[in-house]
Structures are given as C-alpha cells and as structure tokens.
Amino acid sequence: MRLILLGPPGAGKGTQAQRIVDKYGIPQLSTGDMLRAAVSAQTEVGKRAKAVMDAGKLVSDDIVIAIVSERIDQDDCSNGFILDGFPRTLIQADATEKMLAVKGLELSAVVEIRVEDEILADRIAGRYTCANCGTGYHDENLKPKVEGVCDKCGSTHFKRRPDDNRDTVKTRLQAYYKETSPLIGYYYAKGKLHSVDGMAEIDQVTAEIETVLSGL
C-alpha cells in the first residue's frame, strides 16, 4: 500500500497518517526526516545533500527524489509507505511516478482531505504536539486523555509550531493553493485520487479513509 495524503495545512493529514501507520504497520515518510537521516548516515546522496546545504542552497528536486528512492528501498517499506509532505509540485509528482516505475512500483492511492479555509484557521491555531514523541493534539477536538500528559509516551512537555497562528495561515494557504493543489487534478487524471470530507469528526474521517483503503 503506497499512499500520498494531500490537503492544506491543518487538514488533519498528520493525525490520519498516524492512524494508518498504527493499523497497517507501514512507515510514514517525511522528506525532512529522510534528508536528515541520509546526511547523518553519510549515504552517497546524503553527502550530496550536505554539500548543497553547507553552501547555503536549497536541496534540488533530483536530490530529494534520490533520497526518497533510497528510503523506500529499505525493508520496512516492503509492504508500502505513506509519503508525508511530498510531492509538493507537479514536477516532483512526475519525477516520483517515474522513480517508482523504475522499481516496478506505482502509487496505490492519493487521498485528499478537503477542509474549508475558515475551519483551517481554527484548527491550526489550536494544535500542538508532544515535545518528546511528536504525537499531535488540539485545544478543542483532540485533547490528551489525561490533561497535560501525552497519551503515547507519558511526557508532560508539549510545544506549538511558531507559524501555527492565524496571522500566517493566509500566507501558508496561498502557498499551498499555488504549488500543491494542482496535484489534485494531476492524480485525478491518473485515476488515483480519492477525496474525503476533512470537516467531519476525526473518527469519521478515519472511517472514510478506511473505506478507500479497503477497496484497493
């Protein structure tokens, strides 16, 4: 099961991705995490990435694709994976398709989580994570079972992203609609796109996604 979750900031991709990970045992692959791991392990592509970053430049698409390719060759991806935050552009999406095809693989599905902009602002402003394990929470609709204690690891330390506030939501959404939303049409044309109502209760969104996945 090889998946991509699409949706604007605050749509709930992280929450739903973690539920898929827990149920199906496939890893959630973040480009940031993969990049740091490749640099730390000093893989060939990791060394290329480090040289670019040390020069103060942005890592190119071809290096990112190479890092993703290297990561999905690992044993824990043998039954599938979830791509988190990637691809972001049509160029990256096309390169990802070609990279998978070389391996004899293809995406199983692309799940779009749809949420209206005004709801996103409320969601983003209220979310926070466990500083220890990264489990996500929300002030209103996803609180820890015991106040101040992480459900997953028991930590009492939490943090909020500096850009998780109403002032930056508009800018982040504009960037999403300009760069990433064209992927919706791209994957629809390929017959891979499945849209779910991200404005429903969290468990209902999970149920809708499960309906999609069970039909693959």
From Swiss-Prot:
GO terms for biological process: AMP salvage. It is an enzyme of class 2 (transferase). SUPFAM superfamilies: P-loop containing nucleoside triphosphate hydrolases. One of its GO terms (molecular function) is adenylate kinase activity. The keyword Metal-binding applies. Its EC number is 2.7.4.3. It is found in: Cytoplasm. Belongs to the adenylate kinase family. Consists of three domains, a large central CORE domain and two small peripheral domains, NMPbind and LID, which undergo movements during catalysis. The LID domain closes over the site of phosphoryl transfer upon ATP binding. Assembling and dissambling the active center during each catalytic cycle provides an effective means to prevent ATP hydrolysis. Some bacteria have evolved a zinc-coordinating structure that stabilizes the LID domain. NCBIfam families: adk (TIGR01351), PRK00279.1-2 (NF001380), PRK00279.1-3 (NF001381), PRK14527.1 (NF011100). This is Adenylate kinase. It comes from Allorhizobium ampelinum (strain ATCC BAA-846 / DSM 112012 / S4). The lineage of its organism: Bacteria, Pseudomonadati, Pseudomonadota, Alphaproteobacteria, Hyphomicrobiales.
